[in-house]
C-alpha cells in the first residue's frame, strides 16, 4: 500500500483519531512556526504542503493569515473541504511536484519533510516560490540535523534557525506539564540532550535569493 492509499483510508475523522488535543496542538505549532525565523506581516500567505486534512488552516486563519493546503491524498483533501468548505484553496497534488500560482510568504511542511525522494530538487523548488521562510519539523533520532542544515544551504536557503518542540501529539498533558515542556524547549543544552530521547526540531529557513517572480 502506498503512502497516499494509506492516508486515503485514514482520512475520515483523521485529526480526531491522530491527535489527543487537535486544537491545542495545531495552535501551538502555528505559534512556533510564526515565531521562528523572520516575522510574517498580517495577511501573509501560508502554503501548507502535505497538509493532510488541513488541520493547520484554522489557527493560521485565526492569526490573520491566508492559507492554502496541498496534499497528495484526495481523501484528505475531501475531509478538509467537508470541514472548511470554500473558505481556503485546497488542492490534490504531490508536495515535491506542486508549484503555487504565485509566490507565497511561508511554506509549511509538518510531519512530511522526509517524503520527497530528491530533497535537493524539492528544496530548490520551494526556495524559488517562497518569499520569507520555509518552516518544517523533523525527528533528530531519524534525520541528522547537520546534514539537513547543509542541504538547506546547498539548495537555495541562507539563514537557518531551529528550536526544540516537546508538546506530544498523542497525549494531552495537564497545564503544569505543558508549562514544564515549554520551559524545557528553552533550556539550551538540556533541551538538546532531551531530543536524544523525545521531541522534534522545528526549523525555519530563509531563502537566500528572492526571485523576480510575483
Question: What does each model-identified segment do?
Answer:
Residues 158-168:
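Conserved S-adenosyl-L-methionine
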Residues 53-97:
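Class I SAM-dependent methyltransferase SAM/SAH-binding core
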Residues 135, 150, 166-214:
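A C-terminal cap/extension of S-adenosyl-L-methionine-dependent methyltransferases
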